[in-house]
């Protein structure tokens, strides 16, 4: 079987998967995407005093302001998740969750930690794709009305979302002289480039979903660590943040790469 035959078979599989799952794949994608906000909002409720004390100790802002910070995180994340899942005011929910990401990036000094910053940016990329999807749904009620100019922001949002999503994979690269890691880096880098430029996008994104899900289950198995150990919370944070990026990639699989992509340009050629 030649290289073209393998690619053709893989693309047929991706198309078949999309046909079978197209009814519920966007719902699964949204649930995965907001999972990190849902988990963090619930954690804020159960760890209210610990989070308040941490913010107060870090910024020396007093109990009142620290409590306001925890409340904003709790309410903002849970309400945003409810709106996204119920598909009501999704654009406002996305802007609110963007604000939560920015707030946490500053409050928890993520700005100075390149790995966590890249993961937060990847999470923002997922929200950007969700925002593009909500714009698409809003336009669908005007089917038949020319919207070429109005669709441009959506296309660039999809491009920005794809590019930001690949930052997640930059944090997974290993620079050890190990055959498995070298192979993983080569294959992973090729796939993220394909997603970023929008070439064979659905197949590349679906492959990344499978790969990332496997890595997530293996390396971030927080359920194997007792809840009282700090590593439990650390792995849980990593697990759900990775699930959110998986949700963003599933949106790419479900909706396609958008107008600013090699796949779309090929249709014009």
UniProtKB/Swiss-Prot annotation:
Instruction: Pinpoint motif Di-lysine motif by residue range.
Output: 266-269
Q: Name one GO biological process term.
A: lipoprotein transport
- What InterPro entries is this protein classified in? Surf1/Surf4 (IPR045214), Surf4 (IPR002995)
The UniProt entry lists membrane topology as:
Multi-pass membrane protein
Q: Which GO terms describe its molecular function?
A: cargo receptor activity
- TM region(s), chain numbering: 64-84, 92-112, 157-177, 179-199, 203-223, 242-262
Q: Which domain of life is it from?
A: Eukaryota
One Pfam annotation reads SURF4
Question: Can you cite an annotated GO cellular component?
Answer: endoplasmic reticulum membrane
Main localization, broad class: endoplasmic reticulum
What does the UniProt entry say about where the protein is found?
Endoplasmic reticulum membrane; Endoplasmic reticulum-Golgi intermediate compartment membrane; Golgi apparatus membrane
List UniProt keywords, sorted A-Z: Endoplasmic reticulum, Golgi apparatus, Membrane, Protein transport, Transmembrane, Transmembrane helix, Transport
Function recorded in the entry: Endoplasmic reticulum cargo receptor that mediates the export of lipoproteins by recruiting cargos into COPII vesicles to facilitate their secretion. Acts as a cargo receptor for lipoproteins bearing both APOB and APOA1, thereby regulating lipoprotein delivery and the maintenance of lipid homeostasis.
Q: Which family does it belong to?
A: Belongs to the SURF4 family.
Anything noted about its domains? Answer: The di-lysine motif confers endoplasmic reticulum localization for type I membrane proteins.
Descriptive protein name: Surfeit locus protein 4
Q: Which organism is it from?
A: Gallus gallus
């Amino acid at each position: 079987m030649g290289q073209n035959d393998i690619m053709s078979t893989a693309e047929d599989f991706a198309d078949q998967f999309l046909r079978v799952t197209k009814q519920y794949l966007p719902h699964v994608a949204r649930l995965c995407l907001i999972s990190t906000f849902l988990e963090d909002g619930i954690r804020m409720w159960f760890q209210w005093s610990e989070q308040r004390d941490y913010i107060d100790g870090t910024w020396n802002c007093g109990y009142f302001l620290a409590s306001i910070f925890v409340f904003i995180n709790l309410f903002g994340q849970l309400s945003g998740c409810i709106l996204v899942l119920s598909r009501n005011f999704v654009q406002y929910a996305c802007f609110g969750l963007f604000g939560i990401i920015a707030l946490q990036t500053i409050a928890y000094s993520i700005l100075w930690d390149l790995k966590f910053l890249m993961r937060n940016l990847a999470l923002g990329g997922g929200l950007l794709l969700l925002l593009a999807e909500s714009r698409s749904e809003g336009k669908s009620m005007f089917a038949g009305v020319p919207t070429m100019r109005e669709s441009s922001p959506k296309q660039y949002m999809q491009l920005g979302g794809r590019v930001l999503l690949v930052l997640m994979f930059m944090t997974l690269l290993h620079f050890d002289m190990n055959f498995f890691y070298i192979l993983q880096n080569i294959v992973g880098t090729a796939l993220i480039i394909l997603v970023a430029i929008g070439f064979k996008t659905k197949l590349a994104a679906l492959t990344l979903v499978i790969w990332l899900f496997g890595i997530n289950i293996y390396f971030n198995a927080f359920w194997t660590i007792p809840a009282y150990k700090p590593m439990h919370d650390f792995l849980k944070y990593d697990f759900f943040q990775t699930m959110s990026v998986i949700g963003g990639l599933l949106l790419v699989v479900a909706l396609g790469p958008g107008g600013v992509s090699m796949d779309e340009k090929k249709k014009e050629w």
